[in-house]
Amino acid sequence: MNSCHLQFKVYASGVIANDKKVELHKTFRALGMSSIYDINLTGLDKGKMAANLGDAHEHIVAGILIRLGFDVGIVDVSGTKYDMLVIAFEKPPPDGKKVILRAQLRTASRSVSFIGGGRGGIDREYKSGVKTRKFTTKDSDLILAIDRSCFDVYVIPTEFIARWGNSKAISKMQPLKNNW
């Protein structure tokens, strides 16, 4: 069961909720939708839709960070080991100096994978020797994992994952949820 919640008031189709925290998936069911992440109105094939979701999640996370006051740049070059640059501060302004953080974005449902380098989607030509690797501090400073069903963002210092396995359940990372 997902822990994502949404404050809402809906006055359509006989659904009324008065500022109660309602689990997101129940909200979407009440509105006639199954969930936010499995709506594919255009009928794209599964591989293309997965790639599009990854791109969309990069922009959603960038938007959240910008709304929080961070400067963000999405890296639009394939093959890089990080997805975005985030300008943060060592200490709160005005005393703290700016620091540029390399961030790797991951989409999470029940867990976050810390493995990269694999080929997503449909590969029309099989090539052996594709190298997957676990992210390290040589690759990025942060892993930003977005929960695909409610857009909570888990802010994970890359140095943490050196002690973890190849993935971790988001239920075990609650202190990192939206911890800016």
For the regions a protein language model found, what residue spans apply to each?
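Mixed-charge (Asp/Glu-Lys/Arg
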Residues: 1-80, 86-180
